[in-house]
Amino acid sequence: MSKLTIEQFIAAIKEMSMLELNDLVKAIETEFGVSAAAPVAVAAAPAAAEAPTEVTIKLVEAGANKVGVIKLIREITGLGLMEAKTAAETAGSVIKEDVKTEEANEIKKKFDELGAKVQLV
């Protein structure tokens, strides 16, 4: 097996879809016993908890209109057909990260209209 150079490795990562990158991170976590979560520094608790300005949209359930959900996922993310289909069939799939709350609520409404269930975290 030939060794990849750093440049080749980075180029291969750039070509991966979001789902493939997610699988890669999980495999690295499992293989090396590490976590991709950023270390948290202990700080003083804020005086008042603010509502998050950016959220992550996760698909809980695609519902009966799976074709419509796949089309909506493609529209939102720009994923290819197979990646969008895989995301629609996988419960807990991250549809989009770091979305402004207003935009996330609009996207959630579109999924609700299709009979799908999404979670904003």
Curated annotation (Swiss-Prot):
GO MF annotation, one: mRNA binding
Protein's UniProt keywords contain Ribosomal protein: yes
Keywords, sorted A to Z: Ribonucleoprotein, Ribosomal protein
CDD domains noted in UniProt: Ribosomal_L7_L12
Gene Ontology process terms (BP): translation
GO annotations of cellular component type: cytosolic large ribosomal subunit
Cited SUPFAM superfamilies: ClpS-like, Ribosomal protein L7/12, oligomerisation (N-terminal) domain
Oligomeric and partner information: Homodimer. Part of the ribosomal stalk of the 50S ribosomal subunit. Forms a multimeric L10(L12)X complex, where L10 forms an elongated spine to which 2 to 4 L12 dimers bind in a sequential fashion. Binds GTP-bound translation factors.
Family the entry assigns: Belongs to the bacterial ribosomal protein bL12 family.
Summary of the function given for this chain in its UniProt record: Forms part of the ribosomal stalk which helps the ribosome interact with GTP-bound translation factors. Is thus essential for accurate translation.
Protein name, per record: Large ribosomal subunit protein bL12
Organism per entry: Ureaplasma urealyticum serovar 10 (strain ATCC 33699 / Western)
Gene (name only): rplL
